[in-house]
């Protein structure tokens, strides 16, 4: 298991935000200080600090993806027509692991990544084991037949913690879903406020 997955709830504590809105988050148990810090006082962040925090929240939300992958997506967002921050959100939501999470085939982005890595997920009927794979509008995402009875998948599908967004369609009986359209920032059901505009400011310094 990677260090990124082992530390998923440490991300919540470090950023002071319950990124995925989960009841298991340490923030729901009063552990609000970053790991290793015991004092209650926090300095007001500088503009740089605020921008950095916005970037870390967005990276952390999508499974603490690497800086290299995140920067590559940002650079592509810049090259595309339209608003860079909206483009960035759209590209993040097109990642296969993000789509698997949104369809409620997994309880967290980390678990979604593991399902993809371990070949439990199909795209248009073909096995794909690359979490960063770019899903296109109209693509059908499904759980492999032999994996449909996995407890982790069934529990995620039945969970009432979150809903499937309207830019996707899903049939949990068949464990199959469709990526209908690329969302805008306002469409994405983040549990906390995301500020991709500050991410743009961070990289534009």
Curated annotation (Swiss-Prot):
Pfam family, one: S4
Keyword rRNA-binding: yes
Presence of keyword rRNA-binding: yes
Keywords recorded for this protein, A-Z: Ribonucleoprotein, Ribosomal protein, RNA-binding, rRNA-binding
InterPro entries associated with the record: Ribosomal_uS4 (IPR022801), Ribosomal_uS4_bac-type (IPR005709), Ribosomal_uS4_CS (IPR018079), Ribosomal_uS4_N (IPR001912), S4_RNA-bd (IPR002942), S4_RNA-bd_sf (IPR036986)
GO MF annotations, alphabetized: rRNA binding; structural constituent of ribosome
GO terms for cellular component: small ribosomal subunit
Span list, region Disordered: 20-47
Gene Ontology annotations of biological process type: ribosomal small subunit biogenesis; translation
CDD domains the record matches: S4 (cd00165)
Boundaries of every S4 RNA-binding domain copy: 94-154
Gene3D superfamilies (UniProt xref): Ribosomal Protein S4 Delta 41, Chain A, domain 1, RNA-binding S4 domain
Function summary: One of the primary rRNA binding proteins, it binds directly to 16S rRNA where it nucleates assembly of the body of the 30S subunit. With S5 and S12 plays an important role in translational accuracy.
Subunit structure: Part of the 30S ribosomal subunit. Contacts protein S5. The interaction surface between S4 and S5 is involved in control of translational fidelity.
PANTHER family xrefs: 30S 40S RIBOSOMAL PROTEIN, SMALL RIBOSOMAL SUBUNIT PROTEIN US4M
HAMAP family the UniProt entry points to: Ribosomal_uS4_B
Family named by the database record: Belongs to the universal ribosomal protein uS4 family.
Protein name per the record: Small ribosomal subunit protein uS4
Taxonomic source organism: Paramagnetospirillum magneticum (strain ATCC 700264 / AMB-1)
């Amino acid at each position: 298991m990677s260090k990124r997955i082992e530390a998923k709830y440490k991300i919540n504590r470090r950023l002071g935000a319950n990124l995925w809105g989960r009841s298991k988050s340490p923030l729901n148990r009063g552990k609000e200080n970053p790991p290793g810090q015991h004092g209650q006082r926090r300095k007001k962040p500088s503009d740089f600090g605020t921008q950095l925090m916005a970037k870390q929240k967005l990276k952390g939300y999508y499974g603490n993806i690497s800086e290299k992958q995140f920067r590559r997506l940002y650079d592509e967002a810049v090259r595309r027509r339209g608003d860079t921050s909206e483009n960035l959100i759209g590209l993040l939501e097109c990642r296969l692991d993000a789509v698997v999470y949104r369809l409620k085939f997994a309880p967290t982005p980390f678990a979604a990544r593991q399902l993809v890595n371990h070949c439990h997920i199909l795209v248009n009927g073909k096995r794909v084991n690359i979490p960063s794979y770019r899903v296109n509008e109209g693509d059908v995402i499904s759980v492999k037949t032999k994996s449909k009875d996995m407890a982790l998948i069934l529990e995620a599908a039945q969970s009432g913690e979150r809903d499937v967004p309207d830019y996707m369609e899903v049939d949990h009986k068949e464990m199959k879903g469709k990526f209908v359209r690329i969302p805008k920032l306002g469409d994405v059901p983040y549990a906390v406020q995301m500020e991709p505009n500050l991410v743009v400011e961070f990289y534009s310094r």
